[in-house]
């Protein structure tokens, strides 16, 4: 892969605001492209192939694994998820900054394989604020919230393994900081 300085990893615990920060980054900078993952799971209501995910069959996914066509991949909840290498390469060659919004373990894998890539870990202002954000989504049962919070503690403890650590107090300020890092 060429010019890995244009490969930006954004990670952090669930509820930290990765999606919100990334949406703002994309709105403010047309040179940034958000990588689309491939998955074997079925599309959810409103999701579109080639926009939200590349929806592919398990046989094709496993074939892509065998051919080493993923930047990273994982199996989660009975489905496969991965970042297709060809699309990332194509966008970098066209001059885009490629952004990966990825969970912490996947981010560590990519950073290990491609140390020249740039990794940014987003922290919540506090554990209390993180819990509030997760609860305010209103989409999860207590047991799932507890799992997310427990996982967040583990992930936050590994934040020192990333190039930059930013606390997401305010989306606008966080976006400005990320843009400053990307452009430096």
From Swiss-Prot:
The record's listing under SMART domains reads: GuKc
Q: Which reaction does it catalyse?
A: GMP + ATP = GDP + ADP
Q: Which organism is it from?
A: Prochlorococcus marinus subsp. pastoris (strain CCMP1986 / NIES-2087 / MED4)
Show the PROSITE patterns listed in the entry: GUANYLATE_KINASE_2 (PS50052)
Q: What does this protein do?
A: Essential for recycling GMP and indirectly, cGMP.
Q: Give me the residues that bind ATP, please.
A: 12-19
Family indicated by similarity: Belongs to the guanylate kinase family.
Ranges for domain Guanylate kinase-like come to 5-183
Top-level enzyme category: transferase
**What InterPro entries does the annotation carry?**
GK/Ca_channel_bsu, Guanylate_kin-like_dom, Guanylate_kinase, P-loop_NTPase
State where it is primarily located.
cytoplasm
Q: What is this protein called?
A: Guanylate kinase
Instruction: Identify the gene encoding this protein.
Output: gmk
The reply on keyword Lyase is no
């Amino acid at each position: 892969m060429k010019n890995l300085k244009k490969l930006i990893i954004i990670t952090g615990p669930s509820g930290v605001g990765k999606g919100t920060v990334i949406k703002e980054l994309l709105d403010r900078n047309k040179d940034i492209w958000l990588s689309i993952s491939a998955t074997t799971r079925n599309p959810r209501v409103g999701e579109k192939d080639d926009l939200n995910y590349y929806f592919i069959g398990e046989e094709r996914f496993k074939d892509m694994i065998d051919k080493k066509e993923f930047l990273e991949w994982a199996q989660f909840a009975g489905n496969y998820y991965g970042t297709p290498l060809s699309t990332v390469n194509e966008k970098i060659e066209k001059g885009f900054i490629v952004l990966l919004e990825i969970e912490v373990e996947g981010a560590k894998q990519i950073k290990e394989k491609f140390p020249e890539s740039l990794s940014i870990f987003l922290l919540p202002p506090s554990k209390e604020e993180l819990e509030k954000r997760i609860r305010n989504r209103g989409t999860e049962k207590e047991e799932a919230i507890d799992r997310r919070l427990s996982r967040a503690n583990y992930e936050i403890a590994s934040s020192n393994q990333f190039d930059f650590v930013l606390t997401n107090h305010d989306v606008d300020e966080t976006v400005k900081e990320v843009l400053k890092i990307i452009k430096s």
